[in-house]
């Protein structure tokens, strides 16, 4: 009888261990997220005590409150307290009083690693991929969007994360917590609805040639996505230009204007001193899909354009122009003209010629642009007072891969309501030639 009890207890323990292992496995592999990357210091805080463990297992206790972790002389410091020269782990002594990084809570483990010849640090958050996605998807889409659009975003974000696990790019971590990787907000960014839909697609991954895809995504395409080769110069088979239904996006169309002096100054600050701006050379924007050209991609996004100056001409990529001028995207037309008023103030007189009031008469905004001289693909200044450069564009982001507002548009179609797992149709539209599989 005693032996039977021992065996029963043993099997129960084995089953519990197996259950815990299976549960952990169902959350996917661990991913290391760079929260604070290559900085001189970072703020850690907790309402309770924090245990700091160095690479040799030595422990130091930090009191409740805020502490600044920094690197000096190849060693870590917590405020003025000297710590180890190796990597550090931070553990809350009370689980109900977690450690915060720059006042944000995170699941999983927190460590600090040295970078830049032991002069700077990176704070890393290691946690299962599925739990990581809880803090990503809610930051990337509006949580109350159609379920199928959110599921598509979840699969794209998961595929992107798994791709980076297979293709190490950084020292000490796998992916950044910013838009240079995927925007990740930790526990406080999570939303019950997006978490539910991440769980509904658990493990589902977009795959091409047997490996997770580099599932780029963006907010708004402006009507047509772009092929990767026309944005980054690298042909990726599954990232091609496709038509997009994102017209409901607030960034579907936009206009920004700059004076000559503003453009000249911005170019100079970026290392391109062209002197006085005289004109801009760029193939006119046509209807997508556009035929191949050296200036524009299939969607019409700018691949390159030339600023003509009194000192020299400079040719920049569309991405460089977008970054320098702070444009929403590289999908734009350029015109030169004057910023005319939106309305004219007109006097209203009675039958006797006396003014009885005034009225603002609106002016068609189309008359505000296009005053400059245009010769082929060259826009020149006409020399009139207050001329500006107008960028009339569409979309938000690089325009490659899944369009978040476009996915929403597809999910709202009638056909989407009749088809189960329509998120798969959405993914196959934006990522050509992929297949979907459960990786865990």
Regions found by a protein language model. Give the residues of each.
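Conserved, single-site charged/polar hotspot
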Residues: 2-440
């Amino acid at each position: 009888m005693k032996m039977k009890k021992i065996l029963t207890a043993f099997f129960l323990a084995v089953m519990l261990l197996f259950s815990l292992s299976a549960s952990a496995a169902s959350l996917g592999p661990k991913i290391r997220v760079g929260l604070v990357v290559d900085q001189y210091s970072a703020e850690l805080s907790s309402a309770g005590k924090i245990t700091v463990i160095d690479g040799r297992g030595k422990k130091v206790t930090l009191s409740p409150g805020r502490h600044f972790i920094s690197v000096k002389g190849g060693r870590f410091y917590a405020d003025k307290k000297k710590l180890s020269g190796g990597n550090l782990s931070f553990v809350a002594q009370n689980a109900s009083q977690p450690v915060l990084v720059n006042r944000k809570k995170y699941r999983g483990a927190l460590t600090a690693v040295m970078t830049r010849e032991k002069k700077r640090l990176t704070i890393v958050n290691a946690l299962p991929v599925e739990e990581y996605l809880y803090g990503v998807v809610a930051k990337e889409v509006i949580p109350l969007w159609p379920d199928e659009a959110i599921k598509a975003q979840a699969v794209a974000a998961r595929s992107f994360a798994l791709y980076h696990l297979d293709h190490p790019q950084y020292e000490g971590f796998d992916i950044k917590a910013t838009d240079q990787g995927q925007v990740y907000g930790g526990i406080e960014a999570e939303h019950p609805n997006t978490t539910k839909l991440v769980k509904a697609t658990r493990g589902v991954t977009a795959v091409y040639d047997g490996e997770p895809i580099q599932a780029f995504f963006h907010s708004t395409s402006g009507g047509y996505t772009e092929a990767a080769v026309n944005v980054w110069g690298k042909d990726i088979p599954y990232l091609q230009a496709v038509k997009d239904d994102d017209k409901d996006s607030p960034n579907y169309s936009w206009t920004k204007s700059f004076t000559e002096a503003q453009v000249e100054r911005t170019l100079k600050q970026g290392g391109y001193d062209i002197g006085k701006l005289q004109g801009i050379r760029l193939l006119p924007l046509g209807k997508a899909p556009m035929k191949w050209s050296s200036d524009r991609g299939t969607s019409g996004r700018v691949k390159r354009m030339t600023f003509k100056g009194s000192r020299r001409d400079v040719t920049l990529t569309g991405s460089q122009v977008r970054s320098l001028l702070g444009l929403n995207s590289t999908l734009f037309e350029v015109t030169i003209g004057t910023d005319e008023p939106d309305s004219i103030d007109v006097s209203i007189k009675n039958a006797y010629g006396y003014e009885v009031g005034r009225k603002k008469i609106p002016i068609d905004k189309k008359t505000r642009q296009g005053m400059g001289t245009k010769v082929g693909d060259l826009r020149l200044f006409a020399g009139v007072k207050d001329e500006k450069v107008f960028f009339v564009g569409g979309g938000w982001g690089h325009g490659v891969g899944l369009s978040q507002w476009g996915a929403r548009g597809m999910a709202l179609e009638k056909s989407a309501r009749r088809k189960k797992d329509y998120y798969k149709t959405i993914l196959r539209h934006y990522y050509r030639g992929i297949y979907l599989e459960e990786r865990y």
